[in-house]
């Protein structure tokens, strides 16, 4: 233990031959003089600007308003129907989605006629409603579902004899089946079982009085 360590074991780290980057320090000026023509003083030691320095007259917070500087009433945001025509604007007003418009929309060449037509239709909505209700009660075919176009074309292509034949509602299922399936449907019981059921004595069906109790 004692042979591997010595009292001056850390002494070799501080020898001059190990300190290769150690040199005598150079002389330096304690208070260097300011370079002339390159720097100008604009503030004092405390940070106050000198009187000859140009300043901006605008405020640093141009849009800032304090609590007491706010207006009493802030107007609502106005909608700008820029790309909406007059017809679309009138449609929105009839739907009730846009009540107040501050700016006029772009007017197209045929917007005046369409606007008059729209206003006329809106006025006649309440007048046309009772007539439509009477039509609904008169027409019996309205409850039936509408046929697609392909069925209408097939009905027109059929001859008049086939179109005139109505299909009864209470059609028997056996009549709609082919003759081969009708013949296959025979009575469920053979004749021997039916005869046995007819000639069965009544004693089998009736129970004695002791069993009934």
UniProtKB/Swiss-Prot annotation:
PANTHER family: PROTEIN FLATTOP
Keywords: Cell membrane, Cell projection, Cilium biogenesis/degradation, Cytoplasm, Cytoskeleton, Membrane
One Pfam family in the UniProt entry: CFAP126
Described function: Microtubule inner protein (MIP) part of the dynein-decorated doublet microtubules (DMTs) in cilia axoneme. Acts as a regulator of cilium basal body docking and positioning in mono- and multiciliated cells. Regulates basal body docking and cilia formation in multiciliated lung cells. Regulates kinocilium positioning and stereocilia bundle morphogenesis in the inner ear.
Family: Belongs to the Flattop family.
Region (Disordered): 127-213
Residue spans of biased composition, Polar residues class: 151-213
Domain of life: Eukaryota
InterPro entries documented for this protein: Fltp
Gene Ontology annotations for the cellular component aspect, listed alphabetically: apical plasma membrane; axonemal microtubule; ciliary basal body; cilium
Compartmental location: Cytoplasm, Cytoskeleton, Cilium basal body; Cell projection, Cilium; Apical cell membrane; Cytoplasm, Cytoskeleton, Cilium axoneme
Principal subcellular localization: cytoplasm
Name the UniProt record assigns to this protein: Protein Flattop
GO terms (BP aspect): cilium organization
């Amino acid at each position: 233990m004692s042979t591997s360590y010595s009292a001056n074991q850390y002494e070799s780290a501080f020898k001059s031959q190990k300190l290769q980057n150690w040199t005598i320090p150079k002389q330096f000026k304690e208070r260097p003089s300011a370079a002339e023509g390159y720097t100008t003083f604009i503030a004092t030691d405390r940070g106050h600007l000198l009187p000859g320095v140009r300043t901006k007259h605008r405020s640093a917070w141009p849009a800032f308003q304090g609590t007491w500087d706010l207006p009493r009433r802030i107007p609502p945001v106005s909608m700008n129907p820029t790309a909406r025509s007059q017809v679309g604007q009138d449609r929105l007003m009839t739907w009730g989605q846009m009540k107040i418009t501050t700016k006029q929309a772009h007017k197209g060449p045929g917007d005046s006629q369409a606007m008059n037509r729209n206003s006329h239709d809106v006025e006649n909505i309440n007048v046309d409603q009772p007539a439509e209700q009477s039509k609904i009660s008169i027409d019996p075919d309205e409850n039936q579902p509408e046929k697609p176009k392909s069925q209408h074309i097939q009905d027109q292509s059929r001859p008049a004899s086939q179109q005139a034949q109505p299909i009864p509602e209470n059609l028997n299922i056996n009549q709609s089946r082919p003759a081969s399936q009708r013949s296959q449907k025979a009575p469920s019981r053979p004749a021997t079982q039916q005869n046995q059921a007819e000639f069965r004595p009544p004693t089998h069906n009736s129970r004695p009085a002791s069993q009934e109790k």
